[in-house]
Amino acid sequence: MIGWLKDLLKANALDESPVARDRTATPPATTRPAPTGQAGDSVRAAPGETLAKQLALVIDLNVCVGCHACVTSCKQWNTSGSAGPLADERPYGADPTGTFFNRVQTWEAGTYPATETIHFPKSCLHCEDPPCVPVCPTGASYKRKADGIVLVDYDKCIGCKYCAWACPYGARELDETRQVMTKCTLCVDRIYDDALPPEDRKPACVKACPTGARLFGDVKDPDSEVSAAIRERGGYALMPEWETNPANRYLPRRVTRSQ
């Protein structure tokens, strides 16, 4: 899938971007540095490299109530942090636009009267084999060696959207104001901040969730909370047929009352 997509982009899509056509054009200015500053080769994972550590989210669909606390806390932290400011051109209405790293989709399942409401939070899954990385023409998109987090170097990003086309989960968004691609960073500027109390060194969405539906940790550590939850609750990967090996996992819903 990735090889086919790379061939297609090389053959056609590069000609569609005004910035790509004019290689002397200056990339769009950014108002903040990338979450990790300049990302040299020393911090980038090589394609297919096996990492010893992989930070990720595990989301319990059984207790998510769709309150959007994760969405608003993510927006607040990242707008004021190193990834922001995040644009809000038209945040409300039938066709909202604006930059969100995390969204909650809600729908009704089943047939009346045996119906139920499903709340499904979705953000970047920090895949082990992220298709967004090899298609980036400037090397702005990369996966970190140290913890497996997938990030965007804003100083290199030209907003061409190739990574958004490659992502099967719709996890990347163009910030229309800054003209750079944005996505969940797992609050990388927060989880390593020694100025914060240890209990606060977790993604803003995890800290804000009132039902404890969001867990955070190293899925490569068999003794971690997230690994135990995946093992004991049957945590599953989203759309495994794409072979991206997403790090984030979901815990399935359970029947908690008689239907």
Segments from the language model and where they lie:
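Non-ligating segments of multi-cofactor redox enzymes
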Residues: 1-259
